[in-house]
Amino acid sequence: MRSDMIKKGLERTPHRALLKGTGVPQSEMDKPFIGVATSFTDLIPGHVGMRDLERFIEKGIHTGGGYAFFFGIPGVCDGISMGHKGMHYSLPTRELIADMVESVAEAHRLDGLVLLTNCDKITPGMLMAAARLDIPCIVVTAGPMMSGRGEAGRKYSFVTDTFEAMARYKAGVIDEKELKVCEDNACPGMGSCQGLFTANTMAILTETLGMSLPRCGTALAVSALKRRIAFASGERIVDLVRNNVTPRSILTRAAFENAIRVDLALGGSSNTVLHLLAIAHEAGVELPLETFDILAKETPQLASMNPAGEYFMEDLDAAGGVAGVLMQLGDKIKDNPTVMGMTTLQLAASIANVDEAVIHPLTDPVKKEGGIAILFGNLAPKGAVVKQSGVSEAMMKFIGTARCFNSEEAAMAALMDGNIKAGDLVVIRYEGPKGGPGMREMLAPTAALMGLGLGDSVALITDGRFSGGTRGPCIGHISPEAAEGGPIALVEDGDRIELDIPDRRLELLVDEQTLSERRARWQAPEPKIKTGWLARYAKVVTSAYTGAVMSAD
């Protein structure tokens, strides 16, 4: 065992003394040492219930014959950090988390890891660490929140309803009482945000990849099932250590293709493009950005999930969960091993019934194509991402007049002041991985567009990214980004921009001579943040089309 390096032999007498100083009995020294990387914090609804899950994981580890050690990992809530300086830190924490898990596991020669996670960047950070370390690992996602409840049984979604309510109140569509009812009822308790936003999409994809136990991706945070899954995960990690089942034997090209197909079938968050690219990078799996679009054209959308649709995570779980989606996708899914021991196809075959009102069959899809599309053109030579499942038919093709803003705040002010009109195309730039830095989510302006009733007449493009709660004609991840001199930096107010999602094009309708003249005049702006972690991050982070991973060069 790896842990023998810190507990066996004469030379390790000081190491054993330190371990005994923590309370480890001599009788436990021959057992596998299992680290539990926990992202508990009482700052985030998605993580506030983890203390309970920690207990069940620990019980499972000891039942399985291992010895558990806990260590902490930071958790940032994208909702709380949204719309201000805090959002600069969200995506970079993914890299910090991967580095921290790696550091603790390697420094203490842990035999295996249980990765307790839930929210947006924490789950991919944990998976990146698992792929990088390639020691036995199992992921426990803490589970989604129940939908909120309002008057007359109305269901509330935190992300969609609260952010859009701000603009609706500003526009006079709702009054202060309705706003307060939404605020008070949108989050009824612990768990990740209720729809198919980034956290829940990543939990589902973690199960699809084979890195968590069946039902883990959809079992509600408040459920007894989630606790049983936590216990079983603790027990299972000891078996994985004894049999040396490591993440890279599970995270194959087939696993990533399966995850992309499930994402497309459910209409998941566009952030998953960044995260799957980054996890594949750590696993040594070649996964070009174009793969998402190739699979989207042959994988129909099978579910209508909130925010663009009517169903919540509780509905998906009851309808069959991940296994139900795999079953409905049929021969589009490739067989692959999982941490459970059963293969992906065995998991799909394990479910008896699927509620086809929620998870449609291939013969009756919600939409003919998957939920995400990759666009290219002279405005995005290396690609851009759109969650096409959230775009109305009226906006699948659009030509608009550019309104340029060099920050999210400037665009948000223009929206809330009523300065954006039908036919405009909002351009938010210098918000990419380097330029932001941190590639902030543009949920506030996209929610304002919808709340102001502009979702069928105004589009938005950015080198930043979007929340899983974003819906509407919003194109992100434009690469190269403005801070690297990408074409989005050359757009001027009044330019015409063509968006054609069916044809996968994003074009700036300006002649090449004019663009060459603008390019010659362009100068990179001063960094927005010059000190601290983010200043270092901006120097080494790569482009969105590579997953915004940090360069080792």
Curated annotation (Swiss-Prot):
Cofactor(s), by name: [2Fe-2S] cluster; Mg(2+)
Gene Ontology terms, MF aspect: 2 iron, 2 sulfur cluster binding; dihydroxy-acid dehydratase activity; magnesium ion binding
EC number: 4.2.1.9
GO biological process annotation, one example: L-valine biosynthetic process
Positions bound to Mg(2+): 78, 120-121, 441
Superkingdom assignment: Bacteria
The record's free-text note on cofactor binding: Binds 1 [2Fe-2S] cluster per subunit. This cluster acts as a Lewis acid cofactor.
PROSITE patterns reported for this sequence: ILVD_EDD_1, ILVD_EDD_2
GO CC annotation, single: cytosol
Positions where N6-carboxylysine occurs in the chain: 121
Pathway participation: Amino-acid biosynthesis; L-isoleucine biosynthesis; L-isoleucine from 2-oxobutanoate: step 3/4; Amino-acid biosynthesis; L-valine biosynthesis; L-valine from pyruvate: step 3/4
Xref: Pfam families: ILV_EDD_C (PF24877), ILVD_EDD_N (PF00920)
UniProt binding sites for [2Fe-2S] cluster: 119, 193
Reaction catalyzed: (2R)-2,3-dihydroxy-3-methylbutanoate = 3-methyl-2-oxobutanoate + H2O; (2R,3R)-2,3-dihydroxy-3-methylpentanoate = (S)-3-methyl-2-oxopentanoate + H2O
Family under the similarity heading: Belongs to the IlvD/Edd family.
Subunit composition and interactions: Homodimer.
Name of the protein: Dihydroxy-acid dehydratase
Record organism: Geotalea uraniireducens (strain Rf4) (Geobacter uraniireducens)
